[in-house]
């Protein structure tokens, strides 16, 4: 939170307000917010833990501006962020928008590796704001903007526990509002600090994809099914390798592709090495969550659900 607020202080544009909503956190940031009250027009709100949707909706109700920007507390904002947002709105106004995320040079090698896998075309198909993409861009809540009036007309974030940002983005398009990517309005986004937390995150992302498909029929694309196909393919190849060692060649080739891409982008052999397990955790976790939710929701006809509920928000 300290880094997020410090980044907002350094913005060249100063005409904005900041609303911080504490969602029952075990590590309150009120003292941090107090340190910035003489440098930012800032409001601190606290509520019982109820998940990010309710917290964001509460925050927007307290806002007074024409546009509202949604940022995660683990983001760091570059100096030109608001300038880039304003320039894009002046050039081509729209009702909603979002920007990409990047890794900061100060991030740990693991965070850089996870950032690579979360943004690379070879692992996401470019749907998180990359220049190459297999599906249209949908803003995500770590870096999302919207006209306040549109946000309220849409009812804000839904009660989905995971995937609530994509749900809101879908409703933007379904209701005929304009939405686009602001490529220069990027943020530094801190990633999970260990593979266990990362696995939990991506499993829920896979589950959320099926939940989103149920809420918004017709939104499931080929790119969303690729991690599940990858997961099944890995299982088949590993089993086949017990009888034919050359079955491992496709996996080794993919690992080499990830290693080279991450090493070149981050200029670090260590990041390249860490990106290999990060990619397999990401695709495998998402694929398992996707398949699990497909079985429970599409075959067994159960309702919405999520995994690791007790720990995700702590």
Locate each region found by the language model.
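Acidic donor-binding/catalytic loop of UDP-sugar-dependent glycosyltransferases
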Residues: 27-28, 75-88, 170
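Conserved donor NDP-sugar-binding/catalytic core segment of glycosyltransferases
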Residues: 79-112, 116, 185-186, 190
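Acidic donor-binding segment of Leloir-type glycosyltransferases
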Residues: 5-46
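Catalytic donor/gating beta->alpha subdomain of glycosyltransferases that bind UDP-sugars
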Residues: 158-220
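Membrane-embedded multi-pass helical conduit in multi-pass membrane proteins
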Residues: 230-300
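Short, flexible, basic/aromatic active-site loop/helix in glycosyltransferases
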Residues: 99-105, 114-137, 152, 215
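Short aromatic/hydrophobic "clamp" motif used to bind/position activated sugar donors
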Residues: 68
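Glycine-rich, basic loop-to-helix element that forms the pyrophosphate-binding segment
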Residues: 47-63, 84, 134, 138-142
